[in-house]
Amino acid sequence: MINNVVLVGRITRDPELRYTPQNQAVATFSLAVNRQFKNANGEREADFINCVIWRQQAENLANWAKKGALIGVTGRIQTRNYENQQGQRVYVTEVVADSFQMLESRSAREGMGGGTSAGSYSAPSQSTNNTPRPQTNNNNATPNFGRDADPFGSSPMEISDDDLPF
């Protein structure tokens, strides 16, 4: 069976860090994840997905990620139930996160300019080196991922007509 979840979204409230009686860290948080389509009014709707993360990852999330942070989460879906104080059975579906990654710099999130840069939850702030960076004039919003690189190293491809299927 396969139970894999990959989410990218913004944290809707600061993660809530607690500890179990066995001193295991557990953090709960909610992610706002945009849907891929627009509604009848031309607006994108979002799903608000409850998540839980355990142990060191929970402490790291609580220390580094705050409300509004763009993060990526990998994990699995879990359903559980419990009886509330009124004696009613309550069913909960949530994502149990195995790992997370911060997907933008803190300065970008706080509106201090600069673009997004992927960073690990445990990485310190980016280098404070004041070396100027070369400016790029890329109007294409889609990343290239090396599509323009010549996979044949500029050498001619040798194909005879007998090799072609048509």
From Swiss-Prot:
Keywords, A to Z, come to: DNA damage, DNA recombination, DNA repair, DNA replication, DNA-binding
CDD domains (UniProt xref) = SSB_OBF
Sorted alphabetically, which PANTHER family does this protein's record hold? Answer: SINGLE-STRANDED DNA-BINDING PROTEIN
Cross-referenced Gene3D superfamilies, in alphabetical order? Answer: Nucleic acid-binding proteins
Q: Where is the composition biased (Low complexity)?
A: 128-144
Protein name, as recorded: Single-stranded DNA-binding protein 2
- Tell me which InterPro entries the record gives: NA-bd_OB-fold, Primosome_PriB/ssb, ssDNA-bd
One Gene Ontology term from the biological process aspect of the record:
DNA replication
Q: Where is composition skewed (Polar residues) in this entry?
A: 118-127
Write down the superkingdom of origin. Answer: Bacteria
Outline what the protein does.
Plays an important role in DNA replication, recombination and repair. Binds to ssDNA and to an array of partner proteins to recruit them to their sites of action during DNA metabolism.
Do you know which HAMAP family this protein is assigned to? SSB (MF_00984)
Pfam families recorded: SSB
Q: Is DNA damage found in the keyword set?
A: yes
Quote one Gene Ontology molecular function term. Answer: single-stranded DNA binding
Its assembly, as annotated, is: Homotetramer.
For this chain the motif Important for interaction with partner proteins maps to: 161-166
Using the record's annotation, list all stretches that form the SSB domain. Answer: 1-104
Disulphide connectivity of cysteines:
none
Its ancestry begins with: Bacteria, Bacillati, Bacillota, Bacilli, Lactobacillales
Task: Name the SUPFAM superfamilies for this protein.
Answer: Nucleic acid-binding proteins (SSF50249)
Disordered: annotated segments: 108-166
A single GO cellular-component term from the record reads: nucleoid
